[in-house]
A protein has these predicted regions:
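An N-terminally focused, membrane-permeabilizing/fusogenic/translocator signature enriched
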Residues: 1-102, 265, 269-276
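Alpha-helix boundary/N-cap detector
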Residues: 61-68, 132-136, 140, 155-158, ...
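Membrane-inserting effector segments that mediate pore formation, membrane fusion
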Residues: 133-183
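Short N-terminal edge-element motif at the start of the domain
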Residues: 120-136
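Charged, low-complexity surface segments at secondary-structure and domain boundaries
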Residues: 54-62, 125-130, 147-148, 244
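Generic detector of well-ordered alpha-helical segments enriched in charged/polar residues
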Residues: 71-78, 97, 139-146, 150, ...
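Amphipathic, membrane-inserting segments
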Residues: 29, 84-92, 99-111, 121, ...
């Protein structure tokens, strides 16, 4: 009987033929900016050549730049903004944000290129704010005044230094009473407890209010603040402190000054709020 040979390839043999053909095929040049799909032994493989990494320059500007003063904000905004850019002022966070590629009236844009002015409070402001309303020992209060002589306006620094030294000089005395003088000063009566002066009485006169000059934000305008003296006498050591008058209002005023300066330096309105 005559035998016949089956020349039909098995599935495995067919795949080998396909793989061999693919390997033997000449490489094809792909065009940047397009997406390709290829059938491979493992399935369909996609090659995406639309990304910015394949281009000479990015398709659009992205990223958020943070600056710390008004001049830097205006310089960056002037370089990158267009007629549809938007600016938002957040009075709670003391920030001004520019959305440089904001939506236009008739079309959406990415909103991914931004500049943020993040104001920083000065060290002097933070230190005065940290001790605001807190009572200190005589030594601590005197040292605080000495450390902050440059900010003391009324009485002047020299007078306040004398007051600080007077407070330190009676640190061991026992204070008994305090009275308000017609001059607006406070007179605190004390009795010495140091052995050499034990029993000797004296008086310490200090201002009821004093004025400090503080710059709330780095690179910003300075403001005068009134500080009211606070003290506590418990028939022993004297505790002293101060209470600033309406410091939150000063911060808001300082921030509004920054917003006004920016508004005068750009051609788009500054909106009150935050951007999405």
């Amino acid at each position: 009987m005559t035998s016949y040979r089956d020349l039909t390839a098995t599935p495995g043999e067919a795949q080998v033929i396909v793989d061999t053909a693919l390997l033997a095929a000449a490489p094809a040049e792909l065009e940047i900016g397009k997406v390709y799909a290829f059938r491979t032994p493992a399935g369909v493989e996609k090659v995406d050549l639309t990304g910015d990494q394949y281009k000479d320059a990015p398709t659009r500007k992205t990223g958020t730049t943070t600056v710390r003063d008004t001049a830097s904000f205006l310089a960056y905004f002037g370089k990158h903004a267009d007629a549809d850019s938007e600016v938002y002022a957040d009075a709670e966070r003391f920030t001004v944000t520019a959305v440089l590629d904001a939506n236009t009236a008739g079309a959406a844009r990415w909103g991914g290129h931004r500049a943020v002015l993040a104001l920083r409070q000065t060290d002097a402001w933070k230190q005065w704010a940290a001790s605001d309303g807190k009572l200190m020992t005589q030594e601590q209060f005197a040292e605080f005044l000495e450390d902050h002589l440059p900010e003391l306006l009324e009485p002047d620094a020299a007078t306040m230094l004398e007051i600080a030294q007077s407070i330190q000089g009676v640190a061991k005395a026992e204070f008994q009473s305090g009275t308000r003088l017609n001059s607006g000063e406070r007179k605190l009566a004390y009795v010495e407890t140091v052995t050499a002066k034990a029993g000797q009485k004296g008086e310490l006169v200090i201002p009821e209010t004093f004025v400090v000059g503080l710059v709330p934000f780095e690179g910003g305008e300075g403001f005068r603040l009134t500080a009211r003296l606070r003290y506590r006498i418990n028939g022993g050591p004297l505790q002293l402190g101060y209470k600033l008058e309406r410091p939150a209002d000063v911060l808001r005023t300082a921030f509004q000054g920054v917003v006004t300066e920016i508004s005068e330096g750009i051609t788009v309105p500054v909106l009150n709020g935050t951007s999405v």
